Amino acid sequence: MPELKVEVIPEGTVIDHIPAGKWLKVIEILGLTKPNGGTLLIASNVPSKKLGRKDIVKVEGRYLSEEEVNKIALIAPDATVNIVRDYKIVEKFKVSIPDEIVGILTCPNPNCVSNHEYVRPRFKVESREPLKLRCHYCERTIEGEEIIGNL
């Protein structure tokens, strides 16, 4: 397999093993599409032994919050996050979907109390493969692209 050459970042976060074509959604949910979003390096549709094809996002000078990592897990459940300091990976971990997701998604049910009252949307994970979530308030289930569309 040919060597992948992507510039090394001095400080920041590398998100690897994103399914091919999902990099744009990742940078949108992280707010990196704005002019002051930070320096990005993106490798799209690159060969991967694990996924066949994958995307990689490098964010210079920025580290992710737990909520941001949880959002990434909903889009790319097999993603790996690398924390880089002084050009070296100092921490590496796989994202994981928490058992309960609070305040990240909106419920697609227009009649759900979470869309009308001051309560944080809350979802329980019913299954991880395929990913299926159930709203705590109205019991509506969502899965697949509907989850991504409600981030």
UniProtKB/Swiss-Prot annotation:
The keyword Metal-binding applies. This is Aspartate carbamoyltransferase regulatory chain. One of its GO terms (cellular component) is aspartate carbamoyltransferase complex. InterPro entries: Asp_carbamoyltransf_reg_N, Asp_carbamoylTrfase_reg, Asp_carbamoyltrfase_reg_C, Asp_carbatrfase_reg_C_sf, Asp_carbatrfase_reg_N_sf. It comes from Thermococcus gammatolerans (strain DSM 15229 / JCM 11827 / EJ3). Keywords: Metal-binding, Pyrimidine biosynthesis, Zinc. The lineage of its organism: Archaea, Methanobacteriati, Methanobacteriota, Thermococci, Thermococcales. GO terms for biological process: 'de novo' pyrimidine nucleobase biosynthetic process; pyrimidine nucleotide biosynthetic process. Its cofactor is Zn(2+). GO terms for molecular function: metal ion binding.
